[in-house]
């Protein structure tokens, strides 16, 4: 919670990645990536509820067995669609979309984005960075077009 606003974190996770199949279950120092990402959300000062959104029973069971709420969703073209499906039924003021393949995210970054968004009455925030040489042609790099 931040300034009396209830904040949910939805973590989309799917097994059928074409570039890295079963990515959410890949172990990092003995713990599955999806659990590491959920741990990051749990360490945020402002996240009130964490939900892993997945179409897969293996991920759902893993999360539930490790004290994380997981909801089975339909099949979606993007993770954003998966988050939107889950968000429709949440009783909260804000939804933080934390991608299930971002195990290097720091809880402080989440808190800073939440604080900035609420303090400045911003409807949508997206983290990004400037591209490095050659990345524009790399299909593994998600691109953001920003007009300043």
Annotate each PLM feature.
Residues 3-54:
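N-terminal glycine-rich phosphate-binding loop and ensuing alpha1 helix
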Residues 12, 97-99, 127-128:
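Short beta-strand segments
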Residues 47, 92, 119-123:
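Short, high-confidence coil segments that cap the C-terminus of an alpha-helix
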Residues 57-115:
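Short phosphate-binding loop-to-helix
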Residues 107-135:
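Conserved donor-nucleotide/metal-binding helix-loop-beta segment in metal-dependent transferases, i.e.
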Residues 146-148:
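Conserved small/polar residues in nucleotide/adenosyl-binding loops
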């Amino acid at each position: 919670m931040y300034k009396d606003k209830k904040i949910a974190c939805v973590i989309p996770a799917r097994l059928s990645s074409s570039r890295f199949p079963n990515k959410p279950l890949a172990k990092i120092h003995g713990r599955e990536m999806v659990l590491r990402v959920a741990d990051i959300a749990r360490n945020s000062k402002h996240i009130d509820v964490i939900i892993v959104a997945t179409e897969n029973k293996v991920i759902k069971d893993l999360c539930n067995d490790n004290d994380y709420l997981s909801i089975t969703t339909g099949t979606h073209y993007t993770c954003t669609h998966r988050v939107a499906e889950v968000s429709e039924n949440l009783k909260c003021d804000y939804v933080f979309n934390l991608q299930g393949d971002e195990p290097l995210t720091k809880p402080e970054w989440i808190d800073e984005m939440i604080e900035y968004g609420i303090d400045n009455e911003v409807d949508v925030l997206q983290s990004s960075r400037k591209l490095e040489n050659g990345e524009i042609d790399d299909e593994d790099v998600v691109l953001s077009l920003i007009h300043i």
